[in-house]
Amino acid sequence: MWLSLVAIGAGAALGANLRWLLGMWLNALFPALPPGTLAANWLGAWLIGIAIALFAQLPQLSPEWRLFVVTGFLGALTTFSTFSAEMFGNLQAGRYAMALTGIAVHVAGSLAMTGLGIATFGALKQLGGIIK
């Protein structure tokens, strides 16, 4: 139990800090359209695709690794609440097209990135780069 909590906490600390950095770097470039949230969600979706495929191939890994990567790191990196707040802010400001576009880009893009992550793992496996 304690090892699981430590794994989740350590992963969450790393993921949250990366999300904060992405926001600081990218949102300064385009403050009207906060790309930090989108980058965090798309990166997290791509990485979870890789993680899903990797953990399926390595069932012998301790469950703490999955907790560290998926629950901790990726759970803290990706942000449904910030995405929701940003889209709701657009709706409140009457920017309906921007809100609907943002929703479509976040959701469809995240699904596509998860599929791309799974495909990335498959391609690396075929190249012999990982999991022989």
UniProtKB/Swiss-Prot annotation:
Write out the annotated subcellular location: Cell inner membrane
Q: Where are the transmembrane segments?
A: 5-25, 36-56, 68-88, 103-123
Domain of life, source organism: Bacteria
Positions of Na(+) binding: 75, 78
Which GO terms of the molecular function aspect are on file? fluoride channel activity; metal ion binding
KW Ion transport (keyword) present: yes
Q: Name one GO biological process term.
A: cellular detoxification of fluoride
One of the record's GO cellular component terms: plasma membrane
The UniProt activity regulation field reads: Na(+) is not transported, but it plays an essential structural role and its presence is essential for fluoride channel function.
The reply on keyword Repeat is: no
Main location class: membrane
Membrane topology value: Multi-pass membrane protein
Cysteines joined through disulfide linkages = none
| Its job | Fluoride-specific ion channel. Important for reducing fluoride concentration in the cell, thus reducing its toxicity.
**Designated name of the protein:** Fluoride-specific ion channel FluC
Which species is the source of this protein? Chromohalobacter salexigens (strain ATCC BAA-138 / DSM 3043 / CIP 106854 / NCIMB 13768 / 1H11)
- Lineage, uppermost ranks: Bacteria, Pseudomonadati, Pseudomonadota, Gammaproteobacteria, Oceanospirillales
Whichever gene encodes this chain, its name is fluC
